């Protein structure tokens, strides 16, 4: 399903009223990528006519390279420590010095999956990226990315290190699940593409990470992902392809792990054959921090720019522990020795410069100014309201009546001060300051070798307390808070209350994986005690990914709020009291137990230096819901699942194949709001490929989110194009080394979750 880019929703803030805090060297005099020419200075004597700046990004990059010395070229292919930057914020992730003589600006990098990261400055803390994916709304996803791009630009940042599209279904305990866009390559890729478009439209280079199969934090720099070619192409690599082709993002970050025995950042097959070859990526590949292992093999393997803590390209830190010698040669030495052709350096620099031009970095003067905090916070609230998922609502417990004179117990998870956020490089310093900062809660597996320490991050609560928001939206209610540390006291309060709202949370972060799928710190026992005291118990979850819920049968309602962001408390109150009708759908599967996972125990390293295998051939391309379907397992909550305060029906499906059918099809159906409240339904289209080729039972190929008033009906048509970047009708053939549409019968399914679909029709490819 191809979708056009949505319109820019808010213009970039003008800076005429603000003094710039720093500038990129001479950037304001750069000529435009779109065809502007450099003006000549009048002279009393004849002067040559200036050469027009090429309008094509590739031609412009080549023109600059022709004017560069080898040292200048080498300067653009390795980054430096952020605190060595003479310009810009000190707390960036890193920087690459520009070349003022050629009017090439510095590159300043910052993380930002859920807002401007790296403590660059107080920024809007958006809901988690996974919450954005749960909206299943491309317009909302674009607005989400737009906030990040606008704010990174406001801080003088011009390279975005977000865009995490690793598929979470392989390892639901991954500490970075909250940074991702889900388990399905099509949904994850489409949502991520809109994030990237929103960023790059603000003249910030957008990046996709972590390429590839970087699906666990435990021993992440030593993990060797084992995967066959067909499974790789139809799962994780497909998510990257959809993201890149849907966004024109100009940077890909290679990860620190190995794939089939070769480190990602020197993996010729993944970088040159797949990414730059069959996917047609023409931007630059940048290493994750600590993720290079060589100089020449990395450069020849497809790495274009090395970032700090590697220092192989410039020959500074290539210390070989085995014999105590400085072993690896720098790129400068390799060029002199003939170990690397000059043409490869030319290509590396070309890709960096091309990316700068395409994204508008080359022609955008630094414009440092305050962020538009109020407008961006409103988008953060909207993103949470669209992405929260109603998991249970027995007896219509929700929405609560905001006008009732009732007693409400609010219990647990510091709901009196704020809402929890995720940690690591994705951590945002929230605008207005942290409401509460606690030490990191690192599980035992975070201390394994070959990983990143989780101790450098803290538990930060964004300043939007649900308690205050509940009091504001229900002024006639008596609202009482209990911190939940004593289950008996919490149960006693619940027993005397009309309704009990328990907040249950789990801090997740880069540098660690969860040891299981349970909530920590006896919170499950707290919920059980409260539910035993009051049958009208509502649970609100603040967490990064899937969890088990042993108390589920005994509570009346469950709202998955994810990490809800800067305005999370207000959004949660609006959802609980019906000011907003929940419409989110799960972008991941919630397992019933760890025993259902392909690897019930997370693989761990046994050495500080030796790689260890993580066997992804177990599930292959059957990631997430495809695994549960293939294994006939019933999860706790299925992919695509989510309730509403109203009800819907999907009727009268009709499938119309293209001519020939191998080109794709259209499926039409009616969506009706059969309840008494306005609400939105996400109608999902899945496709089953012909039997006998070994594909999953079905795959997501399209969807439509429809907002309807009570009793209203809308005719919907979803078009599935076989030539789109998700290859919806194809499988990867290892014999032809390409995508193939197999002959046979194709079955189209329509429904509102992966476990609630019905056949809509079939068509035959002859």
Region spans (language model):
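Short beta-strand elements
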Residues: 756-766
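C-terminal motif of bacterial Sec signal peptides marking the signal peptidase cleavage site
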Residues: 30-32
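Sec-dependent N-terminal signal peptides
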Residues: 14-25
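Glycoside hydrolase catalytic-domain context in secreted enzymes
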Residues: 40-734, 738-740, 745-754
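Bacterial signal peptide processing site
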Residues: 34-36
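N-terminal secretory signal peptides that target proteins for export/translocation
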Residues: 1-16
């Amino acid at each position: 399903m191809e979708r056009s880019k949505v319109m820019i929703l808010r213009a970039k803030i003008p800076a005429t009223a603000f003094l710039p805090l720093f500038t990129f060297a001479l950037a304001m005099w750069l000529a435009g990528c779109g065809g502007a020419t450099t003006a000549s200075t009048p002279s009393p004597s004849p002067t040559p006519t200036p050469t027009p700046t090429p309008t094509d990004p590739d031609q412009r990059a080549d023109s600059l390279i022709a004017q560069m010395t080898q040292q200048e070229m080498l300067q653009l292919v390795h980054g430096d420590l952020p605190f060595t930057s003479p310009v810009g914020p000190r707390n960036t992730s890193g920087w690459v010095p520009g070349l003022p003589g050629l009017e090439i600006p510095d590159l300043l990098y910052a993380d930002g999956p859920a807002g401007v990261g790296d403590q660059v400055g107080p920024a809007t803390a958006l809901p988690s990226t996974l919450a954005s994916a749960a909206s299943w709304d491309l317009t909302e996803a674009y607005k989400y990315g737009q906030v990040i791009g606008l704010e990174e630009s406001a801080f003088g940042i011009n390279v975005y290190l977000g865009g995490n599209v690793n598929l979470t279904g392989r390892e639901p305990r991954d500490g970075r699940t909250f940074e991702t866009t889900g388990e399905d390559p099509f949904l994850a890729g489409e949502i991520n593409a809109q994030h990237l478009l929103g960023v790059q439209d603000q003249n910030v280079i957008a990046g996709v990470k972590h390429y590839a199969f970087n699906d666990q934090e435990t021993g992440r720099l030593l993990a060797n992902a084992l995967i066959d070619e067909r499974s790789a192409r139809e799962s994780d690599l497909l998510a990257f392809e959809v993201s890149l082709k849907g966004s024109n993002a100009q940077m890909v970050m290679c990860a620190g792990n190995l794939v089939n025995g070769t480190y990602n950042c020197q993996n010729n097959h993944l970088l040159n054959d797949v990414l730059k070859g069959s996917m047609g990526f023409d931007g630059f590949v940048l290493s994750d921090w600590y993720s290079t292992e060589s100089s020449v093999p990395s450069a020849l393997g497809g790495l274009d720019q090395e970032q700090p803590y590697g220092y192989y390209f410039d020959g500074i830190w290539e210390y070989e522990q085995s014999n105590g010698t400085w072993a690896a040669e720098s790129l400068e030495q390799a060029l002199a020795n003939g170990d690397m052709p000059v043409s490869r350096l030319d290509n590396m620099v070309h890709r960096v410069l091309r990316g700068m031009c395409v994204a508008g970095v080359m022609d955008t003067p630094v414009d440092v100014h305050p962020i538009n905090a109020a407008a961006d916070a409103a988008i953060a609230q909207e993103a949470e309201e669209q992405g929260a998922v109603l998991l249970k609502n027995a007896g219509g417990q929700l929405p609560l009546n905001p006008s009732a004179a009732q007693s409400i117990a609010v219990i647990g998870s510091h709901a009196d001060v704020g809402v929890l956020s995720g940690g690591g490089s994705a951590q945002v310093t929230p605008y207005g300051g942290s409401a509460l900062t606690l030490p990191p809660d690192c599980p035992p597996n975070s201390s394994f070798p070959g990983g990143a320490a989780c101790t450098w991050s803290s538990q930060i609560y964004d300043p939007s307390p649900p308690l205050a928001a509940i009091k504001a939206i229900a002024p006639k209610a008596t609202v009482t808070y209990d911190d939940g540390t004593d289950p008996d006291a919490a149960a006693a309060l619940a027993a005397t209350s009309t309704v009990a709202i328990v907040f249950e949370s789990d801090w997740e972060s880069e540098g660690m994986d969860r040891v299981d799928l349970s909530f920590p710190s006896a919170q499950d026992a707290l919920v059980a005690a409260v539910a035993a005291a009051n049958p009208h118990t509502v649970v609100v979850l603040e967490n990064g990914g899937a969890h088990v819920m042993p108390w589920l049968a005994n509570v009346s309602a469950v709202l998955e709020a994810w990490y809800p962001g800067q305005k999370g408390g207000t959004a949660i109150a609006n959802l609980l009291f019906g000011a907003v009708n929940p419409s989110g759908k799960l972008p991941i599967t919630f397992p019933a137990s760890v025993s259902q996972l392909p690897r019930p125990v997370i693989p761990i390293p046994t050495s500080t230096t030796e790689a260890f295998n993580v066997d992804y051939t177990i599930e292959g391309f059957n990631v997430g819901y495809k695994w549960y379907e293939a294994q006939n397992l019933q999860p706790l909550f299925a992919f695509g699942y989510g309730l509403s305060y109203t009800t819907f029906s999907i009727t009268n499906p009709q499938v119309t194949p293209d001519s020939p059918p191998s080109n794709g099809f259209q499926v039409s159906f009616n969506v009706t709001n059969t309840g008494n409240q306005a609400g939105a339904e996400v109608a999902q289209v899945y496709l089953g490929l012909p039997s006998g080729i070994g594909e999953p039972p079905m795959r997501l190929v399209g969807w439509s989110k429809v907002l309807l008033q009570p009793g209203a009906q809308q005719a919907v048509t979803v078009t599935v194009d076989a030539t789109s970047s998700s290859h919806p009708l194809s499988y990867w053939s290892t014999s032809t080394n390409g995508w193939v549409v197999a002959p046979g019968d194709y079955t189209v399914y329509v429904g509102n979750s992966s476990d609630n679909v019905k056949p809509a029709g079939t068509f035959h490819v002859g």
